[in-house]
Amino acid sequence: MVKVYIHDNKVDSDYRAPHNSGTELSLDELAKLGVIYKYCANEEEVNEIARQREYKNRDVVNICEGSFKSEAEFNEKLATFYQEHLHEDEEIRYCLEGAGYFDVRDASTPENWIRCLVESGDLLILPPGIYHRFTLTTSNHIKALRLFKDEPKWQAINRSNQADSLPVRKDYIALINQY
């Protein structure tokens, strides 16, 4: 089951560490950000969600040091994932093995990050337009099923004034202002 809490915002230590401030959050609080969490005991449950949400494509990513040509390439990829960004499409991940952290911006306190620890069986859906970042835990491994409505793509738009003015970002702000 996913663990959700306020990130401690300590930037002087390994971002793969838990960074738990001690302030736990509920799944209802996460839902107010448009983030959907489900525990799925098996892939059949994931398939049902895919059918309901009209996800037509999928792939599996295995992120660990052995997946890259060198430790430097691995660390570079982790740094890329950890840059604050958004997507124009939902980001849907089902953790098959290992663990990772998805950090999402707290809409009510924008200087805060909300950290979600996902482990095997956890499915997380981030809405289009939400600023977020990802990293592994110190175990340095996650195998995840990625679901897509259309052709598989992963286009990150790093946070900037230009990203703030995108229609997808404005739509996201309108969505969370409903709560």
UniProtKB/Swiss-Prot annotation:
Source organism per UniProt: Saccharomyces cerevisiae (strain ATCC 204508 / S288c)
A Gene Ontology BP annotation from the UniProt entry: L-methionine salvage from methylthioadenosine
GO molecular function: acireductone dioxygenase (Ni2+-requiring) activity; acireductone dioxygenase [iron(II)-requiring] activity; iron ion binding; nickel cation binding
Protein's job: Catalyzes 2 different reactions between oxygen and the acireductone 1,2-dihydroxy-3-keto-5-methylthiopentene (DHK-MTPene) depending upon the metal bound in the active site. Fe-containing acireductone dioxygenase (Fe-ARD) produces formate and 2-keto-4-methylthiobutyrate (KMTB), the alpha-ketoacid precursor of methionine in the methionine recycle pathway. Ni-containing acireductone dioxygenase (Ni-ARD) produces methylthiopropionate, carbon monoxide and formate, and does not lie on the methionine recycle pathway.
Positions that bind Ni(2+): 85, 87, 91, 132
Pfam family, one: ARD
GO CC terms in record: cytoplasm; nucleus
Cofactors demanded by this protein: Fe(2+); Ni(2+)
Protein name stated in the entry: Acireductone dioxygenase
Keywords: Amino-acid biosynthesis, Cytoplasm, Dioxygenase, Iron, Metal-binding, Methionine biosynthesis, Nickel, Nucleus, Oxidoreductase
